[in-house]
Amino acid sequence: MIEWIIRRSVANRFLVLMGALFLSIWGTWTIINTPVDALPDLSDVQVIIKTSYPGQAPQIVENQVTYPLTTTMLSVPGAKTVRGFSQFGDSYVYVIFEDGTDPYWARSRVLEYLNQVQGKLPAGVSAELGPDATGVGWIYEYALVDRSGKHDLADLRSLQDWFLKYELKTIPDVAEVASVGGVVKEYQVVIDPQRLAQYGISLAEVKSALDASNQEAGGSSIELAEAEYMVRASGYLQTLDDFNHIVLKASENGVPVYLRDVAKIQVGPEMRRGIAELNGEVVGGVVILRSGKNAREVIAAVKDKLETLKSSLPEGVEIVTTYDRSQLIDRAIDNLSGKLLEEFIVVAVVCALFLWHVRSALVAIISLPLGLCIAFIVMHFQGLNANIMSLGGIAIAVGAMVDAAIVMIENAHKRLEEWQHQHPDATLDNKTRWQVITNASVEVGPALFISLLIITLSFIPIFTLEGQEGRLFGPLAFTKTYAMAGAALLAIVVIPILMGYWIRGKIPPESSNPLNRFLIRVYHPLLLKVLHWPKTTLLVAALSVLTVLWPLNKVGGEFLPQINEGDLLYMPSTLPGISAAEAASMLQKTDKLIMSVPEVARVFGKTGKAETATDSAPLEMVETTIQLKPQEQWRPGMTMDKIIEELDNTVRLPGLANLWVPPIRNRIDMLSTGIKSPIGIKVSGTVLADIDAMAEQIEEVARTVPGVASALAERLEGGRYINVEINREKAARYGMTVADVQLFVTSAVGGAMVGETVEGIARYPINLRYPQSWRDSPQALRQLPILTPMKQQITLADVADVKVSTGPSMLKTENARPTSWIYIDARDRDMVSVVHDLQKAIAEKVQLKPGTSVAFSGQFELLERANHKLKLMVPMTLMIIFVLLYLAFRRVGEALLIISSVPFALVGGIWLLWWMGFHLSVATGTGFIALAGVAAEFGVVMLMYLRHAIEAEPSLNNPQTFSEQKLDEALHHGAVLRVRPKAMTVAVIIAGLLPILWGTGAGSEVMSRIAAPMIGGMITAPLLSLFIIPAAYKLMWLHRHRVRK
C-alpha cells in the first residue's frame, strides 16, 4: 500500500506539487486567522444558581434555600458534583457536569429542575441562573479612581453600575460585567420607635405607606385638537422631600401624620459585602467572558470601548487597568512562536551540516512548514485555538517531523552513490534518476510510515486523560498527532518528488564530510566490541536501567509546575467573623506591605465578593491582584520564587495564613475542586461541631509535616450570633404570633428593603429600620419597643430572650453534606511527598468521628486521577504498538526486541529530571510518553537497516553456509554505514528541543518539563539503537541458527 502511494505520487508529481502549494496557501491563511489564548479552556461545565435571601443568617439560608436546591440538583442528568455555599443573605449552588456535556443543555436541565424546587423556597425568594460563564472568565479588571476629590465612593459606584457596566455588556461574548467595592447609594428611613408608638402606628403601616407612595399609574389617553395625549400620574419618590411628605395617617382632629414626624430620612450606604482597594478605597469592575469564547478579541474590544468612554467620564475620574489577561496571552504566544522559529533554524543548520548538500537539506526543511500548515488546518476544523499547549505540541514534534525525510534523503544519497559506483562511465539521465529516487523511497518508506505511526499512537494515553488534565494536555496531543500525521503523509507523497527535483548534481560521498568521518571513526571500534561481547552489552544495559531507582527515589511529584502568568494573586486564609471596617483596614495594610517589594508595579485588593454569581467569596476572603513589573526591570538574580518568598516574609499579619498563586491557575483549581490552595483536605459529616473539631485537629497535625508552609482550617462555627429566642406563651398573651415578632426583628433590626427609587435609568434601594442606638448591643435590643396588635406598647424582652452565641459564618456543602475545607500551602518540597506524609500523620493522630469522612483535594486530586488513568492506558498502548511492530516485521521476536528495549531509553530522561531538579508530573509523563514513541522509531529504523544488510548476504539464510563472522560483518555494514541518518535524527530532535528546555518565557515551565525527559532520553536512546539492538539482534540470529540446525 505504502509502495503504491509512493509510486503513484511520483508518477503524478505535478498534481501533488500543486496540491502541496494549495495546502501551504490554505495553511498560511489558517495560521494568520487562528484565535489565540494563553491556556486551553480548562473549566468544567458548570451552572451556577444564585439566590438572594436578604438579612438572613447562613444557617437559615442553608436550611430554607441551599439544602432544597442541592438535594434537588443531585438528580440532574450528568451532574457529577453539587457544591452549596450559604452565607449571610445569599445562597450559591454550583452544579458541575461530566466532561463533554453541552453547556446550554446543562443550563436547560438545571432550569427544568429549578422549576420543580421553586415551590419549596420561602415566599418571595426566587432562585436564578448565573451567567453562562465561570470564575475562569475573569479576563479584565479595572478600577475607577477620582483624582479631583470631587466624587465620593457612592458617585463612582453609580457611574459603574448605571453607565460603564451597561456599555461594556454590549460587547459580543461579554457574559457579565460585575461591580465590586465602593458604596451603593441607599435611601434610609430611620424610624423613631417612641414617636411611632406615640402616634399608634405600626411598622407594617409605615411599609404600606412607603409602597403606596412610590408608584406611577397610567390613565389611558385623550384626544385634544385632533391629537392624542397619553395620561399618566407621577408618583415615584425622587427626593428626600418626597419622602418627608408621605402621609401615614390622619389624627383625630384631621391633621395628617407625615413620615417625617416619626422617622429621619437620609441618604447613606447600603450594607457592604465587598471592598476594593487601590492606594485607597475605589470602585472596581470585572469583565467576565462567556464560556468558550475568544479572550483576546473580547479584551481588545473592551479596551477600545473604554477608550471611547473616557470622554464621557466626569472630570477627574480615571479608569485604571488592574488585570489584563491579554498581556499573558501575547507573551505566551510570542514566546512559543519565537521558540518554533528557533527550532526551524537549528534543525535547518543540523541538516545542512550532516548532509553537506544544500538542496538535500532543503528537502528535509520544507517538510516543517508544510507539516505545520497541515496541523493548523486540522486545528481550524476542530475548533482548537493557538495556546501554550497546542503550540507546544507542534514544538516537541519539530525534530521528529523531519526524521522520515532525513532517512529517505540519506537512503537516496546511498543509492545514487551506489549507481555511480556501479556505472562509473555512465551519466545519470533524468528517467534513471527518478527510478533510483523512487526505489530508494520505496525501500524505506513502509518502515518509516510504521515508525511515524508508532510515534503518533504513543500519545493514546494522553487522549484518555479526563477532566482538567485532559483539557490541558489534549490540545498538545492533538497538535503533535496532526503534525506527525502530516509528516508521515509528506514522507510518502511529497518528499520523494522533492528529492527527484532537488537532489541533483554531484552528491558528496559520506566520507567527504568531516563530521560523518568522525562519527564512523568513533562508532566503528565500539560496535566491534559490542558484537564481540553481546551478552555483556545487554547485561550492562540491564544494570544501567536499575540505576534509575536512585534518582526516582529523589525526584518528587506534582500535578503541574506553577506557570508564571506575570501576575500573582494573594489569597490569605483568615478566620471568620470579621467586620467590613476591619476587612478594609486589613486590606490596606497588606496592600501597602506588598507594594514595598520593588518588583511590584500595582496592587489591586479585593475582600468579599463582586456583584456576580461567579464570586461567592465571604467578606473575610481576600483576593489581591499583584501586577509585576517587566522581568527586565527586576533586581539581578530575582525569580518568581524569590519574589514570592520575599512577599511572604514581608506580609506577616496576625490571623493571616498567606497563599500566593497565579490568577488563572487559582480560578481553574477552585472551579474544579473548590480548593484555592495546591493541597486541600475536605472534612464532611453531619454534626458541625464534630466537623470543626476534626478540621482543627488536622490543621494542627498538618503544621508539623515538613514542607507545609501554612495550614488553616475553615471554622464552620466561627460566626457570632445574637439569638432572639421567642417565647410563644408570652407572645400569645399579647395577641402576637411568632411571625409577628419575627417580622419586627426582620424589619426593625435587620432593615427591610421596601422598594426602590427610579431616577432615570438608575435604581436605588429604600431601607426601613430602627436607629443604630436601638440595635447596637444585646441590652439595647431587649429594650426595643413593640406595638402589639391591641396597640399595647411592650419591649422585645417581654416576648423573647436575647442571647449572644456562636454559629456558622458560612456553610459549605458537597453533594448536600456539610463540609469544612483545610487549605495547605507546600513549599521547598514536592506536593506528593507532603501529601503522603500528611495522610500518614492524619491516620496516626486524628480519630475519625462517626459519620465523618476525610478526602484530599486540590491539585493532588487531579494528579491521582491522571496517574490512575495512565497506569491503565500506557500498557494498553504498548500492546497496540507491539501489534504494529509485529505487522511491520512479521516476527514476534523482533517486535519484542524493540518493545523490551524502550525502558533503556527512559534512563537518560529520569537522570536529567533529577539533575535539573524537576518533579514527576503530568507534564514530565507526557515527555516520557513522547520519548517512548521516538525510541521505538529508532529501534524500527535500526532493525530495518540490519535486516536489509542480512538479507543482502545470502549465506546467512542457509544453515550450511552460516557463520558468526559473516553475521558480524553484515550487522557492522548495516549499522556503521547508516550511522549518519541515525546521528542526524538524534541531533535534530535534541536541537529542536533545546530552545524549549532553555526557554524562560510564559509557558516555559510546562514545556521545559515535557522537553527534559525527551532530551535526556535522546542521550540514551541512540545507545539503544546503535549498540543494544545490534547486540540483541545478533543473539537472536545465533539462536535462530541453532534452532535451524
Swiss-Prot record:
It comes from the Bacteria. Pfam families: ACR_tran. It is a multi-pass membrane protein. GO terms for cellular component: plasma membrane. The chain crosses the membrane at residues 14-34, 336-356, 361-381, 388-408, 444-464, 483-503, 530-550, 869-889, 896-916, 926-946, 983-1003, 1010-1030. GO terms for molecular function: monoatomic cation transmembrane transporter activity; xenobiotic transmembrane transporter activity. InterPro entries: AcrB_DN_DC_subdom (IPR027463), Acrflvin-R (IPR001036), CusA-like (IPR004763). It is found in: Cell inner membrane. Its main location: membrane. Keywords: Cell inner membrane, Cell membrane, Copper, Copper transport, Ion transport, Membrane, Transmembrane, Transmembrane helix, Transport. Induction: Transcriptionally regulated by CusR in response to copper and silver ions. GO terms for biological process: copper ion transport. Part of a cation efflux system that mediates resistance to copper and silver. The cus efflux system is composed of CusA, CusB, CusC and CusF. Belongs to the resistance-nodulation-cell division (RND) (TC 2.A.6) family. This is Cation efflux system protein CusA. The gene is cusA.
